[in-house]
Every structure is written in C-alpha cells, then in structure tokens.
A protein has these predicted regions:
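N-terminal leader/linker segments that initiate helical-solenoid repeat arrays
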Residues: 1-54, 58, 62
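Amphipathic alpha-helical repeat scaffolds
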Residues: 29-37, 49, 65, 84, ...
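Hydrophobic face of amphipathic alpha-helices that form TPR/SEL1-like repeat modules
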Residues: 34, 62-69, 102-111, 141-148, ...
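Structural signature of tandem alpha-helical TPR/SEL1-like repeats
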Residues: 38-45, 73-82, 116-126, 153-162, ...
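Short helix-capping/linker turns of helical repeat alpha-solenoids
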Residues: 40, 53-57, 69-71, 89-92, ...
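TPR/TPR-like (Sel1-like) alpha-helical repeat modules
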Residues: 197-208, 212, 216-219, 226-245
Length: 250
C-alpha cells in the first residue's frame, strides 16, 4: 500500500484523529492539501497521513498530489506511493480520487517531475484511464501525447479527438491546440473559421500563444481575416499583457 515509503513525521500522525470520527469534507481535505503543498505544514500532513492509512482514497490522492513535487526526496517518494495506491482503487466511492491520482501521476510521468524519470507508456495508460472517466485535463495531456507521438506513433485524429473533449470543458490550452489542428487540417478537416473562433476563445482567457496567433493573423491577413494594422497592434499589446499573467496549465 501507500504507507510503504512513509518518512519522518509518521509518529505524529497517530495523534491526529481519535477513533474513526467523521470523514472530513472535500473542502477540508483541499485545505490540508494546500497547506502541505505550500509549507509541508505538520498538522495537515499528519491528518492526511492518518486518513490515507485508513484507506481514504480522497486523502491518499490529496497527500500524493501535495507531496509528489516536494523538495525532500523521501516525501516525493511517499507522494508517488500514495498516488499509485489511489490511482489503482477501483471502488465506485473512490473513483473521483482515482481520477485525480491518475491525472497527477500521469502528468508527472509525461512531463518529468524532480528525479522521477519520464515513462510515456505508463503516462498514457494513466491519463487514458482518467480521460475515459471524463477528466478534461487528462484528455488534454492525452491529446499532447498523440499529437507529438510521445512513446507512440503520432496520431493526429486521436489528438484532435482528445483536444476537442478538453476544449468543451473550457481548457484554453486545448482550445489553442484544437485551433491549430483545424488550421492545419491535422486529424480534422481544415476549417479556418473554426480555428479562428477557438483562437479567439483561448485569447479571451489571455493564453499568450493564442493572442500572438491572432496578432499575426491580423498582420498577414490569415484565417479569413483582412490585414488590419490597428487590430495587429492591439493584439500585440495584449500579448505582452498575457505573458505577464500566464494561464495556469491544466
């Protein structure tokens, strides 16, 4: 189970919750997760460890997400161990926690995290499981895997399919990737109007790449737009603004 890699602070966990007690709310778990992520706060860490050891999938996922990028290698290992445990849960009650853990672990294995080596095949399996259960962020990362061919032959049709699912959930980065697909006719029929609408939507969320793409389209008269120096200038200023306020990755 996830308790195999427990490091210092375990002793204090036993004093956390007396008896079984009521299950903490999602908001409480989220708060503890944030406290552990930001400052490895001992009380929050002890509470989550106690619940995780008792088999709470939600606590296992929260603890894993909080620790997977920790500075201390022992805590990172513990985080990964809890994510593995939560991701493997197959009960209906633990399904939302399993999805969160699959996304977090899949992202870590896709992008690399600390000393964790990339493992594209495992990342694809985890993100695929979460995406099939309706997690839009997992769908976005699955789209990236198929678009770029990470550990697998590139598949533009699959990439566009998963970007479309993520885009419908209002993920600006997915809007941008799907817009590129429509612009290039990559995995979907070429459609400048659809691409333009998606670029605009991503730009409204201040995604710098989308704002910059619109600026160049106005400058060069692309995507069915007429060249427009004023619009180009306005979008260029907006690009600088967007770069100062980066969109949080899904």
């Amino acid at each position: 189970g996830g308790g195999a890699a427990v490091t210092g602070g375990a002793v204090g966990a036993a004093t956390g919750l007396r008896g079984a007690g009521p299950t903490p709310s999602t908001a409480q778990l989220d708060e503890w997760q944030a406290m552990v992520t930001q400052a490895t706060e001992p009380h929050a860490l002890a509470q989550l460890r106690t619940l995780a050891r008792r088999g709470s999938g939600a606590a296992q996922a929260a603890l894993g997400i909080a620790l997977v990028d920790a500075h201390e290698p022992g805590l990172r290992d513990e985080g990964r161990s809890w994510l593995e445990t939560a991701a493997a849960a197959d009960s209906k009650a633990d399904a939302p926690a399993a999805r969160r853990a699959q996304l977090a672990l899949g992202k870590a294995l896709l992008l690399g995290s600390g000393d964790l080596p990339k493992d594209y095949a495992r990342a694809r399996a985890l993100l695929g499981a979460a995406a099939e259960q309706g997690d839009p962020a997992a769908a976005y990362y699955l789209g990236l895997i198929y678009r770029s061919g990470y550990g697998i032959a590139a598949d533009p049709v699959q990439a566009a399919h998963w970007f479309d699912i993520a885009s419908r959930a209002d993920i600006p980065a997915a809007d941008f990737m799907l817009a590129n697909a429509y612009r290039d006719g990559s995995g979907v029929p070429r459609d400048d109007a659809r691409a333009l609408a998606l670029y605009r939507r991503a730009a409204e969320h201040e995604l710098p790449e989308a704002v910059q793409t619109l600026a160049m389209a106005y400058r060069n008269g692309e995507l069915g737009l007429r060249p427009d120096a004023d619009e180009f200038h306005a979008q260029w200023i907006e690009t600088a603004h967007a770069l100062k306020h980066p969109v949080v990755a899904p």
